[in-house]
Amino acid sequence: MSSPNNQPLSCSLRQLSISPTAPPGDVGTPGSLLSLSSSSSSNTDSSGSSLGSLSLNSNSSGSDNDSKVSSPSREIPSDPPLPRAVPTVRLGRSTSSRSRNSLNLDMKDPSEKPRRSLPTAAGQNNIGSPPTPPGPFPGGLSTDIQEKLKAFHASRSKSMPEVVNKISSPTTPIVGMGQRGSYPLPNSQLAGRLSNSPVKSPNMPESGLAKSLAAARNPLLNRPTSFNRQTRIRRAPPGKLDLSNSNPTSPVSPSSMASRRGLNIPPTLKQAVSETPFSTFSDILDAKSGTLNFKNKAVLNSEGVNFSSGSSFRINMSEIIKLEELGKGNYGVVYKALHQPTGVTMALKEIRLSLEEATFNQIIMELDILHKAVSPYIVDFYGAFFVEGSVFICMEYMDAGSMDKLYAGGIKDEGVLARTAYAVVQGLKTLKEEHNIIHRDVKPTNVLVNSNGQVKLCDFGVSGNLVASISKTNIGCQSYMAPERIRVGGPTNGVLTYTVQADVWSLGLTILEMALGAYPYPPESYTSIFAQLSAICDGDPPSLPDSFSPEARDFVNKCLNKNPSLRPDYHELANHPWLLKYQNADVDMASWAKGALKEKGEKRS
C-alpha cells in the first residue's frame, strides 16, 4: 500500500488528528491528500507494512513533511467553539491488509480510543451525568447575530412572569416546551421546578402557563368551579355531606398527612370518613367505657343498672352460672341460671345488640316496665347488666314454664282457666292503669306458671317469646292479633287500630287455645297464611264448646267480638261473673301445675 507519490505508507493508532486547515466537509474529497508516514521500523510486519503511527493530513500539497501532526489535546478551551458535526472517517484497506492483522479499535485500551469531545459547563463534572445540551442557538451563526439573539432572549425573559423566569435560562429549555432533543435536568434544578409554592409576579397577572403548572402540582385545583349547587349536590357522596364553599374548613393537625400536603379538609368530610355504624348510636352506646346510657331512663354497665328513678340493681356475670337453655325468642335466648351469692335460681335473658333503633327501644322498654311494674301477676325483676355486646336481664324463674307447654290435650278444669284468665287480666290492668302500657303480645307463651300455682305475665312487647320452647319457635303462622290490627288502613268505625281492646282479643284467643289444647285457627285448615288471616278478619269468631259453662263461653265471646268498641275493658273483665265465681272457690293451682309438669316429663321420656 503506497501514497500517490509512491512513498511507503505506515499507520499509527496512537496518534489520530484532523488538520483544521480545511473544513471537515472537505476530508476525503477530490484534491485532498491522505498521507501516511512510518515512524518506527520495529512494528513492521513480514509484508513490510508498518502499524506504528497513523496521521491524516488534509493539505493538498502532498508533502511528506506535512504528515507529522500533534496528538489531540484533552484540555477544554476557555471559550469553546460552537459544536459542529464530526464526520466519520472510514479507512479503506486492501484485500491483502484485511487478511493480515485486522485494524480493530475496540481491542485497544479504553483510554487510547478516540473520543468525541463536547463542551462542558464550568464547574460541572459530567462523569455519570447525561451530556450537556447544546446552546439555544445551534448552527453556524456569526458572533454578532448570536449576541443579538441573546439580547432579544434576555429582553423577552424580563417580560415573562416570574414563575417562568425561575425555571428557564438562556441555556436550558423549559421541560415540555423547549426544542427537540432537550436533556434531563439535574436533581437540584428539577426539585426547584417542582416546588409546591409557585411564585406569582406582583406586577403581572398569572399566565396560562403558570396556571397549568400550578394545576399539575396541586390536583385539587383541577376541580370545576362553574357548576351550580344542584350539580354539586348530585356529585356529592350520599349522606349529609355538603362540600359547598359556605362550609368553613377546620384546622388540620400539623402531624397529619393532610397538613403535610397542605390540604384543609371540611369538617363534614372528616365526619363522613370517621363515621361508623356505631356512630349513629353514640349517644346511647359508649364503647370505651362499656356503657349503655338511655337518657332519662337507665344506665347499664358490666356491674349492674342504675335507673333515673333512683333504683339500682348491682349484679354481674361473675356471680352467675348458666345451667341450661330454656328457649329462644325473637331477640334473644333465655337460660336457667344460678346466682351464686344468694343461691337464687333465676331466668337470664340475653339480648344481643344489633345496630337497629328498634332493638335499643325494646331493651329500654322492657327494663323500664320490669323495674316499675311491681305486681304479683308480673314476673319479678332482679337486675340487668351490659357486657360483651349483650344486655342480660335477670328475672324471676317460673319453674313450670309457659302455658303452651302445659295445656296438652286441653284444660278441662274451668277453675284453672278462670284463675289463669284472672291473673292475666290483673297483670294487663296494672300495666295500663299504673304505667299506661299496652302489652301488645298476649299469648300462651307469655303466660308463665310456677310449681306453686302462680300465674304471671312476661315479655312486654319487647322480645317476643321469653321462654318459648325451641319446637314452638318454628310456628310462625299463628297470629293472636286482633282483626283491626291485621287490616290495612286507618281507624275502624272511629276507633284507632290498636287500643286496649286489641289485648282483650288476644286474651280471648289465649283462653280458648288453653281450653281446646290447640290454636283456634289451625294452619292446616287453610291453604295459605293469607286465607288464615282472612278468616280472622272476615269469618265468624271461634268459641268454646258447649261442654263449658255459659259464663265461660260468654267471657270468651265478649273478648272475641269483631267490633273492638263492643269488647269489655279490664275492669269489666275482672268483675265478670265467670271470674268472680272462681275467686272464692277452692282451686288447687299448685297440684294442677305439678301434674302438668309430671305429664310433660313422661311424654319427654
From Swiss-Prot:
Gene from which the chain derives: wis1
Record keywords, A-Z: ATP-binding, Cell cycle, Cell division, Kinase, Mitosis, Nucleotide-binding, Phosphoprotein, Serine/threonine-protein kinase, Transferase
One term of GO molecular function: ATP binding
Function recorded in the entry: Dosage-dependent regulator of mitosis with serine/ threonine protein kinase activity. May play a role in the integration of nutritional sensing with the control over entry into mitosis. It may interact with cdc25, wee1 and win1. May activate sty1.
Residues the record lists as binding ATP: 326-334, 349
Protein name (record): Protein kinase wis1
Residue ranges, compositional bias (Basic and acidic residues): 106-115
Sequence positions bearing Phosphoserine: 168, 253, 469
UniProt superkingdom: Eukaryota
Cysteines paired by S-S bonds: none
Residues annotated as signal peptide: none
A single BP term in Gene Ontology: positive regulation of G2/M transition of mitotic cell cycle
Catalytic activity: L-seryl-[protein] + ATP = O-phospho-L-seryl-[protein] + ADP + H(+); L-threonyl-[protein] + ATP = O-phospho-L-threonyl-[protein] + ADP + H(+); L-tyrosyl-[protein] + ATP = O-phospho-L-tyrosyl-[protein] + ADP + H(+)
PANTHER family: DUAL SPECIFICITY MITOGEN-ACTIVATED PROTEIN KINASE KINASE 5-RELATED (PTHR48013), MAP KINASE KINASE PBS2 (PTHR48013:SF25)
Coiled coil segments of this chain: none
CDD domains linked: PKc_PBS2_like
Organism (species): Schizosaccharomyces pombe (strain 972 / ATCC 24843)
Phosphothreonine: modified positions: 473
Compositional bias ranges of the Polar residues kind: 1-20, 188-200
PTMs per UniProt: Dephosphorylated by pyp1 and pyp2.
